[in-house]
Amino acid sequence: AKGGSQAITDAMVSHLRKLGGEVETGRWVGAIDELPAASSYVFDTSTSAMARIAGDRLPDVFRKKLNRLRHGPGIFKIDYALSDPVPWTNSDCRRAGTVHVGGSLDEIVRSEREMWEGIHSDEPFVLTSQPTVSDPSRAPEGKHVFWAYCHVPAGSELDRTEAIERQVERFAPGFRDCVLERNTMNCADYEAYNPNLIGGDIVGGVTDWRQLLT
């Protein structure tokens, strides 16, 4: 969507309001009784928050399962303002909206394994997005935006800027010369921004087969 995902959210909110709905933000909900009476509720929260808010309205067994959910790793993310597009050596990457930076398969496996072991990898697997490739309106004329993140052990507050930029530079020499501004967020920043992102976990829990089937 032109303008980014916020444009999609704005369109959905606009449609809801046309149908008579209301949207309220910036309000902490501690218990389900604080919400308007309804026949059903949809939660987009952590499982522990859902268990706390719904309280006795949930069966004890189910509530205990919600509170037992294992949270996954966190992330360290950098948002960039760039003077030029990312100078990827691979021409296909210059046209892609998303680029996963990992080097060899062995490197990727090692990076993710180390993260699960509580180690900050020297060569992290980095996920990047370059929105202005397809939507120039996301930045001032002639400029670009770019973001990149890597997985880190849950709750990590280590600054991973150098490791991430070193990885991008491997495949896009001169990248650092394009950086005008950067903003970083670690696990603590994410949880402060949204308490549902426990330990910086942005996917809502470990996605292994045991948890997916229980």
Give short role names for the model-derived ranges.
Residues 48-52, 81, 140-167:
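Conserved FAD/dinucleotide-binding core of flavoprotein oxidoreductases
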Residues 11, 15-19, 44, 53, ...:
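Generic, well-ordered alpha-helical scaffold segments in large soluble proteins
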Residues 17-23, 88, 158, 169-181:
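Surface-exposed helix-capping loop/turn segments at secondary-structure junctions
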Residues 21, 25-139:
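Mid-domain catalytic core of redox enzymes
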Residues 80-82, 101, 130, 150, ...:
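Hydrophobic side chains in beta-strands
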Residues 1-30:
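Helical element adjacent to the flavin cofactor pocket in flavoenzyme catalytic cores
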Residues 1, 122-127, 174-214:
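A glycine-rich dinucleotide-binding beta-alpha-beta segment and adjacent secondary-structure elements
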